[in-house]
Swiss-Prot record:
Name of encoding gene: ND5
Membership in a protein family: Belongs to the complex I subunit 5 family.
EC number(s) given by UniProt: 7.1.1.2
Protein's UniProt keywords contain Mitochondrion: yes
Protein name, UniProt field: NADH-ubiquinone oxidoreductase chain 5
Membrane-protein topology: Multi-pass membrane protein
Organism: Paramecium tetraurelia
Length: 570
C-alpha cells in the first residue's frame, strides 16, 4: 500500500510540473493536496505499526539499472521507525503548507509553479528517508538540493534572491561530494548497496584499511565524510552561513526547509548510518561538541537579529545543533521526540510570521512593527503557543524534549562545558521568543506611522485580505491540532512509559553512554526543576519590565545585557 500511495503522489507531482499551464492554479492545488492528503491519511493509520511494534518493511518497486555483471540496482524502499518518523513529519507539515500556500498566494501569477515545487520538495524528502539502497539515497539527496534551489530562487528576477539560492546550492554541493565519496567507500568495503546488508554487517569490517594507505582505517574516513555532509546540510557551526540567506524563499517553502526537509536531512543521515559512524572512535565526542557549539552560536545570533525571518533562521540553526547533539547519544527515540516538537512548532511559527509580514506590507524589520495585536489576534495566540513550545517552558511539549538535553549532557566527556553551552542555548530561546512577541505585537512607541497609514480599514475588509487570512489561519490551527496530538502520542509512548527520571537514567544512560565516571541518580532529578526556576525567573522579568517607566521599547535590541538589566532593575 505504501508503494501505491507514494507512486500516486509522485505521479501527481510530475503531472502538475509538466502540465501546470493546462491545469490552472486550482487544478494544481486540488491534485497535489488530494494526493498528499491520501498519503498522509495512510501514514497515520500505521502509527502503532512502527512506533510500538517497530515494524520493518522492505519494498522493491522496479529494477533500475545494472551496476556490474550480475548485480542490478533496484529502486527500493527500506521503511523502519526512523524512516516512518521523517515521512510522517514531512507529510503532516506538507498537507497544511499546501492549504496555506493556496490561501497565501492565491492571487499571485506563479502560484501553480510554487505549489508544484513545494510538493516536488516533499516527494524528494520522502524518497531520501525511505531509500532502500545507497543509489536511491544519493538520488533523493540530490533531489532535495536541486528542488531547494528552485524554491529559494522562486523570485529569480531579484538579484539577492539568486545570490542566496546559489550560495545555498554551492554549500550543498560540498555535502553532495562528501556523501558520494562515503558511498563509494562503503560499497568498496561491503560490496553491497542495500541498507539491509550494510547496516547489519558493517561491524564485521571494522578493521578494514584503505588499499593504497593501509595506516588509515577506511571507516574513519567514511565517518568523516558522512559527518561533514551532515554538518553542512544541517547548517552546523562553520557551515551555517547559507541558511539565513535561504530566507529569500517564499514563506511556505521556508517553513518546509527549516522544519521537516532540508535541514533535517543531515540528522537523518546520522541516524541512518549510525551503525557505521559508531565504528569511529571520535564520532560521539565530535558530534556532541559541534552540536552544543552550534546551539549556542545560533541562539546568541538570534537574540541580536532584528529581521523577523532571520531570527527564526538562527533559531533553526540552534535547534539543529540540539538535534545533532542528541544524535551523539545513540537513542533514536529521543531524537524523534525532539524532531517532532521542533519541526511542527517551527513550521507553525513560520506560517504565523508570514501573515505578520504580509500585514506589515512586506516589512520584516522588528523596528518597523508594533501594536499588531488588535489587528492579528489569532496570529498572536498561534505564535505564542508555538514559541513557548520551542522555548521549552513548563506545561508545554518543548519542556519535556529540552529536559532530555540536560540529562544527556551530564554523561559525555567535557560534560561541564557541554552542560553550560546547552543551558545558555536554552535560555537564549526565551529571549528571542520574547523579542518577536513584544516588538511586533505590543511595542506601540516604536511603530512607524507609515505602517499605520498603510493599514486602513478598506484593506482589512477587502476580499483579498479577509479570505486569504481566514483560510491561512484555519490551516495553521489544523496544523496546531495535529501537532499536539502527534507530540502527545510520542511523548506518552517514548518518555512517559518510564515512571521516573531515575528509571530513564538506569535504562538508557548507563546502557548507551561511553562515560567512565559513575553519576548520582538523584542529581538527575534536579535538571528539570532547575529549568523550571529559570523559566519562572524569566516570566517575572518580562512582567516586571512591562509595567516599568523605562520600558523595553526604549532599549535597543542590540543591547542584550542592557535589556536584561534594564528590565530587572528599573
Amino acid at each position: 500500500m505504501f508503494s501505491f500511495f507514494f507512486s500516486f503522489y509522485a505521479l501527481s507531482v510530475i503531472f502538475s510540473l509538466l502540465f501546470k499551464h493546462f491545469l490552472s492554479s486550482k487544478g494544481v492545488f486540488l491534485l497535489n493536496t488530494t494526493s498528499i492528503g491520501l498519503f498522509w491519511a495512510y501514514s497515520l493509520s500505521n502509527l502503532n505499526l512502527f512506533f510500538i511494534k517497530n515494524k520493518l518493511i522492505a519494498i522493491h518497486l522496479f529494477r533500475w539499472f545494472p551496476l556490474s555483471a550480475g548485480y542490478l540496482v533496484n529502486f527500493s524502499f527500506y521503511i523502519d521507525t526512523v524512516a516512518y518518523s521523517f515521512t510522517l513529519l514531512t507529510l503532516t507539515i506538507g498537507v497544511f503548507v499546501n492549504l496555506y500556500t493556496y490561501s497565501y498566494f492565491r492571487y499571485e501569477p506563479h502560484i501553480s509553479r510554487l505549489i508544484s515545487l513545494i510538493n516536488a520538495f516533499i516527494a524528494s524528502m520522502i524518497i531520501l528517508v525511505n531509500s532502500g539502497n545507497l543509489v536511491v539515497f544519493f538520488f533523493g539527496w540530490e533531489l532535495i538540493g536541486i528542488t531547494s534551489f528552485f524554491l529559494i530562487n522562486f523570485w529569480g528576477e531579484r538579484a539577492p534572491t539568486f545570490k542566496s539560492a546559489f550560495k545555498a546550492f554551492s554549500f550543498n554541493k560540498f555535502s553532495d561530494s562528501a556523501v558520494l565519496i562515503a558511498l563509494i567507500l562503503i560499497y568498496a568495503n561491503v560490496h553491497d548497496l542495500n541498507f539491509e546488508a550494510i547496516l547489519n554487517v558493517s561491524h564485521l569490517y571494522s578493521e578494514m584499511k584503505l588499499g593504497s594507505t593501509p595506516q588509515i582505517n577506511s571507516w574513519n574516513l567514511i565517518s568523516f565524510c558522512l559527518l561533514f555532509a551532515a554538518f553542512v546540510k544541517s547548517a552546523q557551526f562553520g557551515f551555517h552561513v547559507w541558511l539565513p540567506d535561504s530566507m529569500e524563499a517564499p514563506v511556505p517553502a521556508s517553513a518546509l526547509i527549516h522544519s521537516a526537509t532540508l535541514v533535517s536531512a543531515g540528522v537523518f543521515l546520522i541516524m541512518r548510518f549510525y551503525p557505521i559512524l559508531e565504528l569511529s572512535l571520535y564520532f560521539k565526542l565530535v558530534t556532541a561538541l559541534v552540536g552544543a557549539l552550534t546551539a549556542l552560536a545560533g541562539g546568541l545570533s538570534a537574540v541580536f537579529q532584528t529581521d523577523l525571518k532571520k531570527i527564526l533562521a538562527y533559531s533553526t540553526i540552534s535547534h539543529c545543533g540540539f538535534l545533532i547533539f542528541l544524535c551523539s547519544f545513540g537513542n533514536f527515540k529521543l531524537v524523534i521526540v525532539y524532531l517532532f516538537v521542533h519541526g511542527f512548532f517551527k513550521a507553525i511559527s513560520f506560517l504565523c510570521v508570514g501573515n505578520l509580514i504580509r500585514f506589515s506590507k512586506s516589512y520584516q524589520d522588528l523596528r518597523r512593527m508594533g501594536s499588531f495585536f488588535k489587528y492579528l489576534p489569532a496570529e498572536f495566540f498561534f505564535l505564542v503557543f508555538s514559541l513557548l513550545n520551542l522555548s521549552g517552558l513548563p506545561f508545554f511539549f518543548g519542556f519535556y524534549s529540552k529536559t532530555l538535553l540536560f540529562m544527556i549532557s551530564d554523561v559525555l566527556y567535557f560534560r561541564d562545558a557541554i552542560f553550560c553551552m546547552i543551558l545558555l542555548s536554552c535560555i537564549t530561546g526565551l529571549f528571542y521568543s520574547f523579542n518577536i512577541l513584544y516588538y511586533s505585537f505590543f511595542d506601540s512607541k516604536k511603530a512607524r506611522k507609515s505602517i499605520y497609514a498603510g493599514v486602513i480599514s478598506e484593506y482589512l475588509r477587502s476580499y483579498y485580505y479577509s479570505n486569504t487570512t481566514m483560510a491561512s489561519n484555519i490551516a495553521i490551527f489544523l496544523l496546531i491540532v495535529s501537532s499536539c496530538l502527534l507530540c502527545a502520542y510520542l511523548i506518552n509512548f517514548y518518555l512517559l512509559s518510564l515512571s521516573t527520571a531515575t528509571d530513564f537514567y538506569l535504562v538508557y544512560v548507563k546502557t548507551f553512554s561511553f562515560t567512565l565516571a559513575p553519576l548520582s541518580e538523584a542529581a538527575l532529578l534536579n535538571y528539570s526543576f532547575f529549568y523550571w526556576i529559570i523559566a519562572i525567573f524569566f516570566v517575572i522579568l518580562v512582567l516586571f519590565s512591562y509595567y516599568q517607566k523605562k520600558t523595553t521599547a526604549e532599549v535597543s535590541l542590540a543591547g542584550f545585557f542592557d535589556f536584561f538589566l534594564g528590565g530587572f532593575f528599573f
